[in-house]
A protein has these predicted regions:
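N-terminal Rossmann NAD(P)H-binding glycine-rich loop of SDR-like oxidoreductase domains
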Residues: 3-26
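Amphipathic terminal alpha-helices
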Residues: 303-327
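Glycine/proline-rich active-site loop of Rossmann-fold NAD(P)-dependent oxidoreductases
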Residues: 156-159, 171-197, 215, 237-249
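Mid/C-terminal beta-alpha module of Rossmann-like enzyme folds, strongest
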Residues: 221, 231-279
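Catalytic helix-loop patch of NAD(P)-dependent Rossmann-fold dehydrogenases
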Residues: 121-163
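Conserved C-terminal active-site "lid" loop/helix of NAD(P)H-dependent oxidoreductases
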Residues: 227, 260, 278-298, 319-321
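Conserved Rossmann-fold NAD(P)-dependent oxidoreductase catalytic core, especially the SDR/UDP-sugar
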Residues: 92-137
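NAD(P)H-binding glycine-rich loop region in Rossmannoid oxidoreductase-like domains
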Residues: 40-42, 50-88
Length: 327
């Protein structure tokens, strides 16, 4: 088994490669890591190729002898690059794979941005049969285009592909910093933009967290997945190619994160205060039943564990927080 990992230096890529290399199920597997902005070290089981998936020659070289592709490379809110990566890059990958004599399975890690994340009011849980509803911006649109391109290759060529649709992916202290009123906030909303500036500074100083509310003052439920659970789903997909072929799976926690429960738990366990913040966003519930049924996969990181892991995580001097992309 020879596995190409695009976006290999990201949080999912690095975790996935590490798990493959230590798993007894993949002891004969080798990795080709396609890197762009950052780099990895080559080993006897990892070959590193530097370049862009938008370049056909780079893709052709990276896919030589490949049996499986784990496609993680993506763009956030970068209009100048998003179509090169999302459309052109994915097209070259799919074209080269379908003509390859060694290729067996293509795994796309998509995003629930293709379903609107928490921008739209879905009256029922979001399943894999619901139509695409991208929220404003080029990133969400790119997630729709990825899924549609893979789906059409499955129709056109009976292409052996699987889409794993993930919501916001957490690792290390990501969740803690997603609740910061400071300029160090991870992702969105940017909480300090939703309150008075002086209040935001005081909340940040005190360690107070936001309790996100919808337009009716009800705590919002928002979908997340821990990187460990996503990696497990990726490996389950490789090991279960028959039920996975041609399918899309929601890969997420069993229940969305309830910001009301987050506030209660952090107050109870760490005496952390919260302040309600009214927003334009909506509660959603991403349904992962299909992945449980067909892949025999189940997430292990619960709400309380997600919180505890994030607050307990200690960074050393070589592990500074850095955001590699806008959006």
């Amino acid at each position: 088994m020879r596995i190409l990992v695009t976006g290999a230096t990201g949080k999912v890529g690095q975790s996935c490669i590490a798990e493959i290399l230590q798993s007894s199920n993949f002891e004969n597997a080798s990795i080709v890591a396609l890197c762009h902005n950052r780099n990895l070290n080559s080993t006897n089981r990892i070959k590193v190729i530097k370049g862009s998936i938008a370049d056909q020659n780079t893709v052709t070289a990276a896919l030589e002898g490949i049996t499986h592709v784990i496609h993680l490379a993506t763009c956030k809110e970068t209009p100048e690059a998003v179509m090169d990566v999302t459309v052109k890059g994915l097209f070259w990958l799919l074209e080269e794979c379908r003509q390859s004599s060694t290729f067996e399975h293509f795994i796309l890690v998509g995003g629930d941005a293709s379903m609107g994340h928490f921008f739209y009011d879905h009256s029922i849980p979001v399943t894999e049969t619901q139509r695409h509803t991208a929220y404003p911006g080029c990133y969400a649109l790119s997630k729709v285009l990825e899924e549609v391109m893979l789906e059409q290759y499955q129709i056109q060529y009976d292409f052996p592909g699987t889409c794993l649709r993930a919501p916001w992916i957490m690792e290390k202290d990501d969740f803690k910093f997603s609740l910061s009123f400071g300029k160090d906030v991870f992702g969105g909303p940017v909480w300090r933009d939703l309150v008075d500036e002086n209040e935001a500074d005081q909340y940040h100083k005190d360690g107070t967290i936001p309790l996100m509310l919808d337009s009716k003052d009800v705590p919002i439920k928002r979908n997340f997945v821990h990187v460990d659970d996503l990696v497990t789903a990726i490996l389950c997909t490789i090991l279960n190619p028959v039920p996975a072929k041609g399918q899309t799976f929601n890969i997420c926690m069993d229940e969305p994160v309830d910001y009301g429960q987050v506030s209660k738990y952090l107050k109870k366990t760490r005496n952390i205060e919260s302040v309600p913040v009214k927003t334009k966003y909506c509660s959603t519930w991403l349904d992962n039943t299909k992945a449980k049924f067909l892949l025999d996969w189940s997430p292990e990181v619960s709400l309380h564990e997600l919180i505890d892991r994030s607050w307990n995580y200690l960074r050393d001097g070589e592990d500074a927080r850095k955001i590699w992309y806008p959006g």
